[in-house]
Amino acid sequence: MTVYHFVGIKGTGMSALAQVLYDLGYTVQGSDVEKWFFTQKALEERGIPVLPFSKDNVHPGYTVIAGNAFPDTHEEIEAARQLSVPVIRYHRFLGELASKFTSIAVTGSHGKTTTTGLLAHVMQGAHPTSYLIGDGTGKGEPGSKYFVFEACEYRRHFLSYFPDYAIITNIDFDHPDYFANIDDVFSAFQQMAQQVKKGIVACGDDPYLQNIQAKVPILFYGLGEENDFQARNIVKTTEGTAFDVFVRNTFFASFTIPRFGTHNVLNALAVIALCHYEGIDAGTIAARLQTFQGVKRRFTEKTVGRQVLIDDYAHHPREIMATLEAARQKYPGREVVAIFQPHTYTRTQTFLSEFAESLQQADYVYLCDIFGSAREHHGKLSIRDLQEKIPRSQLLEEQNVSVLKQHRDAVLVFMGAGDIQKFQHAYEQAVLSA
């Protein structure tokens, strides 16, 4: 049997895929940079070897799975070609793997990681289910019929997939380094929808998704009355959110989720609709929704002294609004402080005004330097351009995080898709050593 060697095994998707293959009984190893990433923990727990990059890592009889960040000129990929070892890109391999199961792709501009994790958790309550989540978590369940996986629209990678079912959470303009505009994004999702084999569950509150064409039935969910699955009587508390679900205007069941913000009602509704379609009973769905622990880097909370620290992946204005709304729901009456690190110069430039508007939902705003992508040039843009648009906002550096101590009893929300976590870690150290 072949050995699967992952070039860039610490990537979130790559790490999750390696875990799935390992669990299914395959021999797996990988290589990456030596810097520690949170995705390593699950690999180390399984005893999956993680090696430094070297052309000597590749041997005849191996199959190389290459991360999308690595060019064909990478030493290990070149070594594989010289040895006639097959090299397959991450998204293509994932497409082939998914075809062996009843596959459910979860996609959309926002909310796909949480929705993938929630769907996998709920379905496991009824059937053995394998899954791959974009937070670096994967599980291969031997004998499983279902495979739930996150499908990313970036560079149209999700066009490598031909799933049985798809959940589409929303369509929004993002990844401006690749997509030209919202119409370009829509065309990618439209093409993906045409590849779904059995059925689509889509958010009917989204104006773009209302215009999606497909060869299979589309079930719409949302808060609007015209949806097939509608959430009504939403009650938000500091413990979570309760709501009733109506299927084509007929009461189906009541649900409670230990999550916050309207976006999480929609994520749960997508999962409820898919599970209903697959014949999972309301009692099982309700019980599993209540025990969902969340996914990594999505509203991950920690109490430090009298403050609550939240780590969140939000890196788009719409995501920032949703995260701050959730913080206000769970901690009403407490000061909410946003600490934001913009991710990529192209995104920061494109959404400069929108970032300023969304961040002003917080009581105080601290800005960290822009986290640039290896693929881009920053030109003249700097974090000060964003600071000028947000009254009373301050710049934050790793060395001066102690300034956050003045916000006693506050909720500190660290947001970004780069290395914002290092600012939180630095702050935690500053508090502990005080």
From Swiss-Prot:
GO biological process: cell division; cell wall organization; peptidoglycan biosynthetic process; regulation of cell shape
InterPro entries according to UniProt: Mur-like_cat_sf (IPR036565), Mur_ligase_C (IPR004101), Mur_ligase_C_dom_sf (IPR036615), Mur_ligase_cen (IPR013221), Mur_ligase_N (IPR000713), MurCDEF_pg_biosynth (IPR050061), UDP-N-AcMur_Ala_ligase_MurC (IPR005758)
Gene Ontology molecular function: ATP binding; UDP-N-acetylmuramate-L-alanine ligase activity
Localization per record: Cytoplasm
Known pathway: Cell wall biogenesis; peptidoglycan biosynthesis
Top class in the EC scheme: ligase
Chain segments annotated as coiled-coil in the UniProt record: none
Protein name in UniProt: UDP-N-acetylmuramate--L-alanine ligase
NCBIfam families for the chain: murC
Record family assignment: Belongs to the MurCDEF family.
Pfam families: Mur_ligase, Mur_ligase_C, Mur_ligase_M
Disulphide-bonded residues: none
